[in-house]
Amino acid sequence: MEARAQSGNGSQPLLQTAHDSGRQRGEPDPRDALTQQVHVLSLDQIRAIRNTNEYTEGPTVVPRPGLKPAPRPSTQHKHERLHGLPEHRQPPRLQPSQVHSSRAPLSRSISTVSSGSRSSTRTSTSSSSSEQRLLGPSFSHGPAAADGIIRVQPKSELKPGDVKPLSKDDLGLHAYRCEDCGKCKCKECTYPRPLPSDWICDKQCLCSAQNVIDYGTCVCCVKGLFYHCSNDDEDNCADNPCSCSQSHCCTRWSAMGVMSLFLPCLWCYLPAKGCLKLCQGCYDRVNRPGCRCKNSNTVCCKVPTVPPRNFEKPT
């Protein structure tokens, strides 16, 4: 057993030596090949690579439709640098003749832009000068000249023969007066003034004196009965049931007498109607400004004397 163990332990170094000898005789180890291929860069070389920047762009100018766009060499530089970075190669530099040819269209475009700006300034100055010519000297001299602007249209000279006599319309509506009382006789002034009908709830509720009497004395019931019983459309007895001049006077009065037995407030209608007429006359006398005379002569008011106008030229 001990002999076998010794023989087994001794076989391992033999295998290792045989394996090492096989490596030396055959191909080399790939680890050694990797270490040989990797080159260690110094700090100066790294700084030099980072400092050299070949990607530059010039000022961009909008090309005109007549001109061809200038070639951009910077894009070529960029693509070459991207492909050359893993191989640590620097892109080829352009020759001075190529740089000069690429800058030529750029200078042409800049000159055309500058000439266009000059033409635009010329047109703006010419337009402003034309506007000042149209506005005149009053607007060109600033706010001080605005005081001399004419704000009133000058009137033409008046001649003595152009003055016409005043017509009836020029005299006014209140020019015709009564000869007896001296008050105006126009329709507006002589119209009778009725009692106010919207004197309740700050002139918002319509309540006339006639309606108060009709509802207070139950005459509204009589008017409704006459309205439904009348066959003639032209018969307005329902509006004036106590009228003596309209048709069916006896029939209406007899019907109201029978209804007064059941509605005794109907006996107060005639006295209330008389009081209403009296109040109406008093109110009209106080508030009517015109004439109340029945038969009077009308006199036209004299036009007040006006001093003669001065027809001389204004200074």
Curated annotation (Swiss-Prot):
Q: Which GO terms describe its molecular function?
A: molecular function inhibitor activity; protein kinase binding; protein serine/threonine kinase activator activity; protein serine/threonine kinase inhibitor activity; ubiquitin-protein transferase inhibitor activity
Q: Where is this region: Disordered?
A: 1-39, 51-141
Its subcellular locations are:
Cytoplasm, Cytoskeleton; Cell projection, Ruffle membrane
Q: Where is this region: Required for interaction with TESK1?
A: 178-315
Q: Where is this site: Cleavage?
A: 143-144
Q: What is this protein called?
A: Protein sprouty homolog 2
Q: What is known of its domains?
A: The Cys-rich domain is responsible for the localization of the protein to the membrane ruffles.
Subunit field text: Forms heterodimers with SPRY1. Forms a tripartite complex containing GAB1, METTL13 and SPRY2. Within the complex interacts with METTL13. Interacts with RAF1. Interacts (via C-terminus) with TESK1 (via C-terminus); the interaction disrupts SPRY2 interaction with GRB2, potentially via disruption of SPRY2 serine dephosphorylation. Interacts with PPP2R1A/PP2A-A and PPP2CA/PP2A-C; the interaction with PPP2CA/PP2A-C is inhibited by interaction with TESK1, possibly by vesicular sequestration of SPRY2.
Q: What is the effect of changing residue 55 to A?
A: Abolishes FGF2-induced lens fiber differentiation via inhibition of FGF-mediated ERK1/2 phosphorylation
* UniProt feature, compositional bias: Polar residues: 1-19
Q: Where does the entry say this protein is expressed, by tissue?
A: Expressed in the testes and brain (at protein level). In adult, highly expressed in the lung, heart and at lower levels in skeletal muscle and kidney.
Biological process (GO) annotations held by this record are: branching morphogenesis of an epithelial tube; bud elongation involved in lung branching; cell fate commitment; cellular response to leukemia inhibitory factor; cellular response to vascular endothelial growth factor stimulus; ERK1 and ERK2 cascade; establishment of mitotic spindle orientation; fibroblast growth factor receptor signaling pathway
Q: Is Membrane a UniProt keyword of this protein?
A: yes
User: What is the documented function of this protein?
Assistant: Antagonist of fibroblast growth factor (FGF) pathways via inhibition of FGF-mediated phosphorylation of ERK1/2. Thereby acts as an antagonist of FGF-induced retinal lens fiber differentiation, may inhibit limb bud outgrowth and may negatively modulate respiratory organogenesis. Inhibits TGFB-induced epithelial-to-mesenchymal transition in retinal lens epithelial cells. Inhibits CBL/C-CBL-mediated EGFR ubiquitination.
- Keyword match ATP-binding: no
Family (UniProt): Belongs to the sprouty family.
Which species is listed as the source? Mus musculus
Keywords noted in UniProt: Cell membrane, Cell projection, Cytoplasm, Cytoskeleton, Developmental protein, Membrane, Microtubule
Pinpoint the SPR domain residues. Answer: 177-291
Give a short account of its post-translational modification: Cleaved at Pro-143 by the prolyl endopeptidase FAP (seprase) activity (in vitro).
Q: What is its main location?
A: cytoplasm
An example GO CC term for this entry is: cytoskeleton
- Which intervals of the chain are annotated as region Required for interaction with CAV1? 117-315
Gene this chain is encoded by? Spry2
Composition-biased stretches (Low complexity): 107-130
Which residue intervals are annotated with compositional bias (Basic and acidic residues) in the record? 20-32
